[in-house]
From Swiss-Prot:
Extracellular domain ranges by topology: 25-308
Encoding gene (name): Patr-A
Spans annotated as Connecting peptide: 299-308
Domain Ig-like C1-type: 209-295
Name of the protein in its database record: Patr class I histocompatibility antigen, A-126 alpha chain
Region (Alpha-1) location: 25-114
Glycosylation site residues: 110
Organism, scientific name: Pan troglodytes (Chimpanzee)
Residue(s) carrying Phosphotyrosine: 344
Keywords: Disulfide bond, Glycoprotein, Immunity, Membrane, MHC I, Phosphoprotein, Signal, Transmembrane, Transmembrane helix
InterPro entries reported in the protein's UniProt record: Ig-like_dom, Ig-like_dom_sf, Ig-like_fold, Ig/MHC_CS, Ig_C1-set, MHC_class-I_related, MHC_I-like_Ag-recog, MHC_I-like_Ag-recog_sf
Length: 365
């Protein structure tokens, strides 16, 4: 039996404490990584980010001067040097594996050495309000397309094409799913509980949305009504338009929820309406931070008809910056919770110093 290191003992104690507590709703921990080859310009660039719910808490960039996993949330800064050493070691090992895999995959697809190619990877786990394991996932993509994913049973794989079937056979022979399942159901959950406790003032808060409606004339016959929700957390929110009480799903323009840059989120939904019929339309807002859903209606006497191009442009620019920062990893992420997957990396079975991202050390394709 392996000797339990102090760090592991602390982790288990914090996990036991977490089981006596409850949180509102489910929570998740996810890691995303992206490797981009740069033929003729050195080693591939590797970026990894970790999220608890909608909050980024760690980041690594192989082009950064520090060459270390770095904190991105105040509550993670309390972790000691051993934690950061292990996280850095793990993420660098993953970068090295990706360098090898880029060459292997290029061979699988019979591609030349001239072009740039991309590997993307996502894995993580969810816990319920009682802190117990709900689900785990892992997905891999190559050049922006699905490659292989762990199935919901955490015991089998789905390969996207013939090349991915080669990887599937390798991983099945190595019992990779079993090792990954042990990580997802064990270490991943334990660290997520620890993070939720240490960062509870941030991670378990609810900021209700600030809402308003704007009116944008298109012509003498039509106008756009845009329903805004700003400054809310967590990111999950529902905006719906109704006309005379009937949902207008097909006619609604809805943008993705976007980070505001201050730890909160923004979203809007718009609908084109006949001029003079604005009062027949209502916007309905549902969010965890609201005691009950909000209903908004255009009131021309109290809300000016002013184009808000500056705000829209700012949101678009912010979205572009965020996307660039993670090299499109979040763009590839599944938008539907029932299609979740995750990225496999071999979980250590007895390494008492392993970090929360131990599975970034990937099994080669």
């Amino acid at each position: 039996m392996a000797v339990m290191a102090p760090r592991t003992l602390v982790l288990l104690l914090s996990g036991a404490l977490a089981l006596t507590q409850t949180w509102a709703g489910s929570h998740s921990m996810r890691y995303f990584s992206t490797s981009v080859s740069r033929p003729g310009r050195g080693e591939p660039r590797f970026i990894a980010v970790g999220y608890v719910d909608d909050t980024q808490f760690v980041r690594f960039d192989s082009d950064a001067a520090s060459q270390r996993m770095e904190p991105r949330a105040p509550w993670i800064e309390q972790e000691g040097p051993e934690y950061w050493d292990e996280e850095t070691r793990s993420v660098k090992a993953s970068a090295q594996t990706d360098r090898v895999d880029l060459g292997t995959l290029r061979g699988y697809y019979n591609q030349s050495e001239d072009g740039s190619h991309t590997i993307q990877l996502m894995f993580g786990c969810d816990v319920g309000s009682d802190g117990r394991f709900l689900r785990g996932y892992r997905q891999d993509a190559y050049d922006g397309k699905d490659y292989i994913a762990l199935n919901e049973d955490l015991r089998s794989w789905t390969a996207a094409d013939m090349a991915a079937q080669i990887t599937q056979r390798k991983w099945e022979a190595a019992h990779a799913a079993e090792q990954l399942r042990a990580y997802l159901e064990g270490t991943c959950v334990e660290w997520l509980r620890r993070y939720l406790e240490n960062g509870k003032e941030t991670l378990q808060r609810t900021d209700p949305p600030k809402t308003h409606m704007t009116h944008h004339p298109i012509s003498d016959r039509e106008a756009t009504l845009r329903c805004w929700a700003l400054g809310f957390y967590p990111a999950e929110i529902t905006l719906t338009w109704q006309r005379d009480g009937e949902d207008q799903t097909q006619d609604t323009e809805l943008v993705e929820t976007r980070p505001a840059g201050d730890g909160t989120f923004q979203k809007w939904a718009a609908v084109v309406v006949p001029s003079g019929e604005e009062q027949r339309y209502t916007c309905h807002v549902q969010h965890e931070g609201l005691p009950k859903p909000l209903t908004l209606r255009w009131e021309p006497s109290s809300q000016p008809t002013i184009p808000i191009v500056g705000i829209i442009a700012g949101l678009v620019l912010l979205g572009a910056v965020i996307t660039g920062a993670v090299v499109a990893a979040v763009m590839w992420r599944r938008k539907s919770s029932d299609r979740k997957g995750g990225s496999y990396s071999q979980a250590a079975s007895s390494d008492s110093a392993q970090g929360s991202d131990v599975s970034l050390t990937a099994c080669k394709v």
